[in-house]
Design a protein with these regions (language model features):
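Second-shell loop/turn segments in exported
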Residues: 6-13, 33-36, 99-106
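His/Asp/Glu-enriched short active-site or ligand-binding loop at hydrolase and phosphoryl-transfer sites
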Residues: 19-40, 59-62, 93-95
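Short, small-residue-biased leader/transition segments that mark boundaries at the very start
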Residues: 1-5
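Structured C-terminal subdomain patch of bacterial secreted/periplasmic proteins
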Residues: 60-133
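Stable alpha-helical elements in mature extracytoplasmic
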Residues: 15-22, 28, 44, 109-112
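Extracellular/periplasmic catalytic domains that process cell-envelope and extracellular macromolecules
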Residues: 24, 50-52, 83-87
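Short helices/loops that flank or line small-molecule/ion binding pockets
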Residues: 43-54
Length: 133
């Protein structure tokens, strides 16, 4: 799963979006890889949970100034606990208020590709630069 639930909508990258293509290039299992949209997809939480409850990793971006705990995430939306990645603790987040994520990845997609390879295949390929567990 990708990104977070906001006001009854959960936005995820389309399968043909830049993120969707980078996930494919990273040989990551992305639940919306078969989607043909090149932008973000507005989904209901029910749609996400129906298709993605068994995802291995949940990675998202937010603007906040401090890491989000699992308790804080559940306070925001209790449905997160239905994600297998949540119960296994495979949650990776990048705080875009403290990390130059957009500034760097916009011009260096290879940095983001590397992050996705590590997220999908483990840290045997190195340490994450942007995302934190």
């Amino acid at each position: 799963a990708s990104d977070v639930y906001k006001r009854q909508v959960w936005y995820v990258p389309g399968g043909q979006s830049t993120i969707g293509i980078l996930l494919k290039d990273a040989n990551a299992r992305y639940i919306f890889s078969d989607d043909q949209h090149s932008g973000s997809l507005p989904m209901s939480p029910e749609q996400i949970l129906a298709k993605g409850s068994q995802v291995d990793v949940w990675a998202f971006k937010y603007f906040g100034g401090a890491p989000l705990s699992q308790v804080q995430l559940l306070q925001e939306y209790d449905g997160y606990k239905a994600l297998a990645a949540f119960s296994r603790g495979n949650i990776y987040q990048v705080d875009t208020s403290t990390v130059p994520y957009f500034e760097l990845t916009s011009f260096h997609p290879e940095l983001l590709l590397r992050e996705f390879i590590i997220l999908a295949h483990g840290e045997r390929f190195g340490k994450l630069r942007f995302y934190k567990k």
